[in-house]
Amino acid sequence: MKRIPEPFRIKMIEPIRMTTLEDRTRALEEAGYNPFLLKSEDVYIDLLTDSGTGAMSDRQWAGLMMGDEAYAGSRNFLNLEKAVKDVFGYEHTVPTHQGRGAEQILFPCLVARMKGDKPVFISNYHFDTTAAHVEMTGAKAINVVTEKAFDTGTYYDWKGDFDLEKLEATIRQHGAQNVAGIIVTITCNSAGGQPVSMANIREAAAIAKRHGITVIIDSARFCENAWFIKQREAGYADKSIREIIREMYSYGDVLTCSAKKDPIVNIGGLCCIKEDVDLFRAVQVRCVPMEGFVTYGGLAGRDMEALAIGLYEGTDEHFLTYRIKQVEYLGERLRQGGVPIQYPTGGHAVFIDAKLMLPHIPGNQFPAHALANEVYIEGGVRGVEIGSLLLGRDPATGLQKESPLELLRLAIPRRVYTNDHMDYIADTVIAVLDRASSIKGLEFTYEPPVLRHFTARLRPIA
C-alpha cells in the first residue's frame, strides 16, 4: 500500500542502538520474561505503549517555558480549562497526573451516589487500569462489546461498538439502581484500538438516559475515534474533526482522559464534567488529598500548558491521517507476510492474534505474552500482551478469567518512528512466524495480586 510521508520536519533526534541476540536473551531472562521489566536501553524499537511516549511539537516545547508554577490559580490551568471547553464543550475541569488519577477520584463518587448496594459499571470494553479502579471501589466491571470484535480476521467498521441488546439486558439483570456508570471507551483498546460509531455512542447514551445512568467517556484516543467516524460513517465526511468531537461529547456526562495519548504529552490527565456541579465538587474534594490542589492535580504548570496546546494539535486532520495510515501500513505488511491480526487495524496499534499464531499454547500459558518475548528476542522490538495475563483473576473466586482474545499489541508512539521502522518491525514479526510452532508457554514465578502483568515474573514451561 502507499506510504504517507511524515507531515513534520525532525528538529531533534535520540540515538537508539541495536543489541545482539545474546544481549536480548540475557536481558529478558533478568527481567523475568516480562517486557515491562526490561530496561529501555535494552530495547531497539519500543512499542510497549503509545502513552506518554509521543514526541511533542515545537509549540508544546515553547509552552513548557511558559510554566506558571503557582500552587493555586495557575494561568496554565486557565488555558487548559479554556481548551477543554473549546474541544469538548465541558464546563468543569479537574487536571490529574494521568488517566488513572481521573478514575481514582471519579469512580468512588459515582458509587457513593447510586441508589443500589451492588454496584456495577458497564462498558463496551474496560481497559485494565479502568477495570482495576472499578473493582477497587467494590464494583464489578462488565463488558458488552459487539461480538464482531472477536472475529479478528473479518473486516467490520465498528468493532468497538456496544452490543446494545446486551447493554439493555445487563441493566435489567443488575437493576438500573446498581449501575454506577456506563463507560464508553473510545477507541476500544482491548478490542484492538477499534472505533465506536457515532450512532452507537448516541444510542448507548439514550439507553443510559432512559435509566438515569451517568455516561462516562474514556477519552484516551478520542481524536482517532473522530477520524474513523469522518472516514466511515454516513453524514460525517464533510464535518471537521472538532465538530465530530463536539457531537461525541454531547452524549456524555463526564470524561476521563489519559492525555498521554491523543493530546501527545508525556504526563497528564483530565476529569471533566459537562454540567453537574455536585459531582464536580465531589471530585474536587477527592482530588486534593489524592492528586493535588484542584488547579494543578499533580501536574506542573508547564505540563498543563503543553497539554492545553496538545488538545488542539491532536485534532489536526492531516496529522491524524498520517498517524492512522502509518498503523495501517504496518498491519498490511504483517498480513501480507501471513501474520494474523485484528482486521482492520485500529487507530494506535496493530494487534496480532496470538490464538491463531500460536494455537498450541492455551490461554492459561499466556500465548500473546510468549509471542511478545519472542518478538523482543528476534529484533529488540517491545510490545505488550492484551489477553489472559492482563485480564487476571476473578476477585471473588481467585480463578483465571477467560479472555476472549489473546492479542500482542504493537502500539505506535506519535511522531516518533518513521515508515522505515515499520518495515523493520514487520520483518521481525514475520521472522518469528517462521518458528511459531517451537514457542513455549509461560508460568508464574511471582504473581502480584492486582494488575499483575506490570510486575509479574515468569519462566518458560519446560
Swiss-Prot record:
Alphabetical keyword list: Lyase, Pyridoxal phosphate, Tryptophan catabolism
Molecular function via GO: tryptophanase activity
InterPro entries, A to Z: ArAA_b-elim_lyase/Thr_aldolase, Beta-eliminating_lyase, PyrdxlP-dep_Trfase, PyrdxlP-dep_Trfase_major, PyrdxlP-dep_Trfase_small, TNase
Pathway(s) served: Amino-acid degradation; L-tryptophan degradation via pyruvate pathway; indole and pyruvate from L-tryptophan: step 1/1
UniProt record similarity statement: Belongs to the beta-eliminating lyase family.
Subunit note: Homotetramer.
Record SUPFAM superfamilies: PLP-dependent transferases
Keyword Lyase carried by entry: yes
NCBIfam families for this protein: PRK13238.1
Organism superkingdom: Bacteria
Obligatory cofactor(s): pyridoxal 5'-phosphate
EC number: 4.1.99.1
Catalytic activity line of the entry: L-tryptophan + H2O = indole + pyruvate + NH4(+)
Protein name, entry field: Tryptophanase
Keyword Transmembrane helix among UniProt keywords: no
Source organism of the structure: Nitratidesulfovibrio vulgaris (strain ATCC 29579 / DSM 644 / CCUG 34227 / NCIMB 8303 / VKM B-1760 / Hildenborough)
Annotated positions of the N6-(pyridoxal phosphate)lysine modification: K261
Pfam families, per the entry: Beta_elim_lyase
